[in-house]
Amino acid sequence: MDAAQRQLSDQIDQATQRLIDVARVITEPDLRAPSLLPGWTRAHVLAHLARGADAMRNLLIEARTGHNRPAYASAEARDAGIEAGAGRTPSDLTTDLADSAMAFRTVARQLPDDAWRVPVRVLNSRPFPAHQLLTRRLVEVELHHCDLGTGYSPGDWPTAFAAMKLDKPMRSQREDRLKNAASVQAPKLRPPRPPAPWNPNQRLPGSWLGTR
């Protein structure tokens, strides 16, 4: 992991901490309430973020080993995973979100330099180098945190993310959130006390790296 990749990984850590701080105080009614994404509750958004981390970890492992390990078995399996996760309790869903984020981070931090250049793909997308997974994960966390509708908005984005140069699909998605922000009024969910930190330096059992 070079300096630029480590900086991206650090930004993902910080974005994940902000997300988990909010996830920890979401109540059952809050979780079942609609998100800002049509047809999805807040639980769906959090489940999507957890499964997204697993999918990107799969691709990092594929880049490292050379063995086929698809992000998702199929589009249907992806959707089914989100639906299953959305039915979990707030505590279980937050744990799932934190565990999947930690597992992705661990594999990314240990990835050999040459593996970052290996082409990977998500379902039927065009191949792209594995190093782009870091940017994709950061964008996914920041944008979907806004989609929760808990008060986090583009105005809360760190300057580095707001100014980051992105390829067109991700750039357009970020612009969409900026355009929609003015019309969205959502109450901020605040932790009732200082939240316990998400510890990105915690070591995971080795079996988590390749079997979750």
Where do the PLM segments sit?
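Aromatic- and histidine-enriched alpha-helix N-cap/loop-to-helix transition segments
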Residues: 14, 37-40, 44-51, 136-139
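Conserved alpha-helical segments that form or flank metal/cofactor-binding pockets of metalloenzymes
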Residues: 46-75
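Structural signal for well-ordered, non-membrane alpha-helices
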Residues: 16-20, 24, 53-57, 98-112, ...
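Structured surface interface patches that mediate subunit assembly and partner/cofactor docking
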Residues: 1-7, 61-71, 95, 110-212
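Helix-loop segments that flank and shape redox-cofactor active sites
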Residues: 21-41, 110-126
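Short, extreme N-terminal leader segments that mark the start of a protein/domain
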Residues: 1-21
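A short, structured beta-strand-centered segment in the mid-to-C-terminal lobe
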Residues: 78-100
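Short amphipathic alpha-helical segments with heptad-repeat character
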Residues: 9, 13, 46, 50, ...
